[in-house]
């Protein structure tokens, strides 16, 4: 199996996939996360990266988090990133990820995709949190 992990952040999903023998490619713009491909998701061309069995995208949740009560929300930037992720997800497999309690799923460009959303409990796969 092959996993393309967009906005991979901590890489917890990819670590689990690799531990089960999957080939993974992580993409993130933050060099501190040490992704396989250091790139901006908005500039990622899926046609240059082959086929993947599963594509996971987790744009930064701070733009949509309900837990972020003291910080300013930048829905415009968050929407840019989630639209880029959606473009790539649609190219491959039309699957996506968003924390179950976040605002991303109610943004206008995501409403049409809500019937395909499911909850993934990463804590069941070795991560210290649920998404």
Where are these regions (language model features)?
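Aromatic pocket-lining residues of Rossmann-like dinucleotide-binding sites
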Residues: 17
């Amino acid at each position: 199996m092959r996993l393309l992990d967009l906005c991979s952040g901590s890489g917890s999903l990819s670590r689990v996939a690799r531990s089960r023998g999957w080939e993974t490619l992580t993409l993130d713009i933050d060099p501190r996360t040490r992704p396989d491909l250091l790139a901006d998701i908005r500039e990622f061309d899926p046609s240059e990266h082959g086929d993947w069995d599963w594509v996971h995208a987790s744009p930064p949740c701070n733009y949509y988090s309900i837990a972020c009560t003291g910080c300013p929300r930048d829905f415009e930037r968050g929407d840019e990133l989630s639209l880029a992720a959606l473009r790539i997800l649609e190219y491959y497999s039309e699957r996506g990820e968003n924390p179950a309690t976040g605002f991303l799923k109610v943004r206008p460009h995501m409403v049409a995709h809500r019937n395909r959303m499911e909850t993934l409990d990463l804590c069941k796969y070795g991560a210290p949190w649920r998404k």
